[in-house]
């Protein structure tokens, strides 16, 4: 009997079985996808695409579920998969594409768990794989989406870890990355070979644009462009895109549309649970001041086994009772924010601060904030203006927030000069405070000036934002200010 090494046979064949499994994975039907992949491995044991797609299942399980034990399992299985894939046909465009994408997926998971240093190294290695693939196979456009994601991720790695990427010769460029992903998403819509990968490109493009872009409406425009072509976009209403669309609508202050979109989601026992959608539903209902918002936060906190947005979930649950006037329930739930969850995302850090220092929000200002965030600007204006300043403002923090809220409401109403006036008052009075109001006032002022093409003024306020030392939402505010500076850099003398 003759024995031949695996690499003589191992190939990358994205055949019909693999395509069907990929569709199931993006619909979060992992059990069904696993059955298809097992059948494919039995029929074509030397096809390595099933190994790559199994990595997708683990990636989404970790990225959505955030369970530490699942992440540790993923850490071990991915190394085994790398060893198998490296025995494949090096001449195939899928060889480096698969290796690079697997590194990106693991980097994203590492970032979820705060492993930024290791994530930076993974991003650098993925960049090497995909850059080489682009040189060897310039017509293989799937590579563009991965490179775009790398450029975005390299641009959002926290400052205290970004030096690793610079030493390795990789500079982040968020806008360049978004453009590269957009090219892939647009091309895939008109090309049968790549159409299958359009959902994944859209997942990255819309999510990153909504998270990092200066204007959520731009992400809405992108999503609408592809939504108009549903007939050529099978699987549009899958859970991932419901999540993306709802996230964008939430950021854009389109609460009613976000809730309508979230109602399209109906989980089943065959589908991997996406509990964050309960949190997102609760958040939108809270922004609308719906009395049943608490039910969704309770379901999220009861079922989710991850670590992010737990503290924020307890805070938002506490707020649902605070705006109803139930102070005892507010104190009960805000207290729980100290004992569960991690301190990796700004929302959780801010929730932890509120619990630790017992900074109970001013109810009128809280309602104004929620209505404003939800896009109900008229309701927010009436709520704030129907009260005398003395009846609302009780503390120095209240006065600072009062002026900040006026600035935000005027900004949303298109009254830029009034917005800048109240942002200026907020910056003057709050620059040395640890609350986020002054720093975000500086950021929003920079965005107004950028919108008006007054780039020197925009730079002044972006730099002011970065110089402030508040401890609330610091990472995201600084990140947005840095991105603003990068956008306007070509227009500065």
What are these regions (language model features)?
Residues 27, 61, 106, 113, ...:
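Structural motif corresponding to the intra-repeat A-B loop/turn of tetratricopeptide repeats
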């Amino acid at each position: 009997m003759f024995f031949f090494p695996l690499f003589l046979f191992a190939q990358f064949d994205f055949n019909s079985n693999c395509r069907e499994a990929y569709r199931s994975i993006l619909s979060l039907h992992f059990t069904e996808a696993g059955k298809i992949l097992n059948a494919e491995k039995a029929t074509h044991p030397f096809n390595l695409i099933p190994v790559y797609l199994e990595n997708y299942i683990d990636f989404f399980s970790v990225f959505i579920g955030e369970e530490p034990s699942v992440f540790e399992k993923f850490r071990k299985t991915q190394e085994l998969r790398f060893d198998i894939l490296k025995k494949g046909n090096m001449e195939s465009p899928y060889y480096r594409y698969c290796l690079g994408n697997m590194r990106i997926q693991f980097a994203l998971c590492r970032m979820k768990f705060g492993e930024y240093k290791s994530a930076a190294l993974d991003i650098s290695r993925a960049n090497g794989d995909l850059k080489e693939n682009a040189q060897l196979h310039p017509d293989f456009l799937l590579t563009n989406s991965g490179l775009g994601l790398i450029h975005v991720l390299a641009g959002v790695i926290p400052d205290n870890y970004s030096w690793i990427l610079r030493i390795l010769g990789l500079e982040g460029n968020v806008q360049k990355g978004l453009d590269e992903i957009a090219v892939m998403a647009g091309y895939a819509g008109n090309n049968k070979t790549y159409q299958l990968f359009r959902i994944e490109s859209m997942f990255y493009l819309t999510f990153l644009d909504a998270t990092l872009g200066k204007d959520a409406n731009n992400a809405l425009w992108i999503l609408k462009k592809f939504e108009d072509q549903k007939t050529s976009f099978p699987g549009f209403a899958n859970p991932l895109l419901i999540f993306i669309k709802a996230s964008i609508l939430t950021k854009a202050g389109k609460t009613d549309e976000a809730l309508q979109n979230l109602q399209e989601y109906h989980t089943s026992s065959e589908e991997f649970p996406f509990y964050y959608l309960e949190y997102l539903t609760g958040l939108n209902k809270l922004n609308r001041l719906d009395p049943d918002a608490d039910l969704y936060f309770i379901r999220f906190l009861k079922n989710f086994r991850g670590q992010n947005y737990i503290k924020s979930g307890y805070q938002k649950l506490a707020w649902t009772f605070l705006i109803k006037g139930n102070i005892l329930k507010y104190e009960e739930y805000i207290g729980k924010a100290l004992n569960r969850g991690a301190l990796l995302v700004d929302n959780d850090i801010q929730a932890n601060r509120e619990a630790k220092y017992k900074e109970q929000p001013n109810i009128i200002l809280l309602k104004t904030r929620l209505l404003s965030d939800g896009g109900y600007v008229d309701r927010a204006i009436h709520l704030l203006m129907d009260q005398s300043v003395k009846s609302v403002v009780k503390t120095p923090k209240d006065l600072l927030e009062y002026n900040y809220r006026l600035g935000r409401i005027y900004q949303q109403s298109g009254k830029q000069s009034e917005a800048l006036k109240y942002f200026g008052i907020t910056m003057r009075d709050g620059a040395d405070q640890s609350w986020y109001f002054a720093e975000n006032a500086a950021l929003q002022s920079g965005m107004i000036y950028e919108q008006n093409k007054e780039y020197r003024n925009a730079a002044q306020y972006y730099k002011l934002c970065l110089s402030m030392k508040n401890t609330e939402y610091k990472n995201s505010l600084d990140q947005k200010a840095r991105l603003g500076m990068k956008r306007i850099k070509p227009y500065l003398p």
